[in-house]
Amino acid sequence: MNTRFIFLILPEVHLMDLAGPAQTLHEAIEYGANFQIEYCNTDDTVVSSAGLPIPKINHFSQIEFNIGDFLMIPGADMSFLMSEKFKKNTQLKNWILSMYKKGVKVCSICSGAFVLAECGILDNVSCTTHFKRTEQLQDLYPKTKVQNNILFTQQNGIYTSAGIASGIDLTLHIIEELKGSYFSHLVARELVVYNRRNGLDKQQSDVFKFRNHIHSGIHKVQDWIIENIKKRMNLGNLADIAGMSERNFTRIFRKETGITVNDYITQIRKEKINELLKNPDLSRPKIASEVGLKSERQVSRLMNINKQK
């Protein structure tokens, strides 16, 4: 069964809040994800905050959700979110709340958090929104637990994200939850972005943790390592991929990532091993071969070192 992502397009919608997550999901579908994207609105014709008319699509009341589907709520201009038209739309608010209670996951991008808060969904829930609106969100809805200076939050099937670009980060995070970190990496690479995480995450994927730099040669090497982790790693070969001498490559790699090449390879192997261990059909020797190790003993040693640290 496909996981459905239904975007609720409100009047004065912010186009980037809509387009960023939608395109990210589309790229995931192109890579084979069993996702389905749908759209609904509140009026016959919605006009975006930038003046783009969006012709009639399905009214939200016509949408039927399944447990595990996602309701995506892009941000809209505050003039609409503070309007009587929105505040008095009890049909919309009751619909959103009922969907959440049925097991649908709700996800707001930017000022879309005000919609969830108006429905009461964010009561006693950690959440965030655009940095210019966090104080306003907390003041208007004092039961919320607004978090500052983070990209996104996740609690009890409720996802909220900060500014425009963080909607892409949140969508990549959801894709990773559903399809795994390597699949999310492929989508991020297709979009020419590298995933970032919020400070509340207990565990950050090592596929992305050391990508907070702009050196194209080092990114190219990191891509190669991730995609070829089952192969033997040769420092000279990696330096060639980066287009550098070995000495210069090892120096620049550590400067840009904050970690040595060998330690980075080890981190990627650990993460891959943890993913493979979830598959009961894979033997330890098979797992070893999948991450470029020679034996089950090497796998155990690697994971024991990880626990000791």
Where are the model-predicted features located?
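A short beta-strand/loop micro-motif in the catalytic core of glycosyltransferases
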Residues: V106-C107, C127
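Extended, subdomain-level signal for the structured scaffold at the beginning of enzyme domains
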Residues: M1-V106, V115-A117, E176, H185, ...
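A conserved active-site-flanking secondary-structure segment within enzyme catalytic domains
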Residues: L122-I150
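Conserved anion/nucleotide-ligand pocket segment
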Residues: I150, Q154-V192
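Acidic/polar active-site rim loop that often engages polyanionic ligands
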Residues: V115-G120, I168
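Predominant activation on well-ordered alpha-helical scaffold segments within soluble catalytic domains
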Residues: A19-A22, Q138, D169-L172
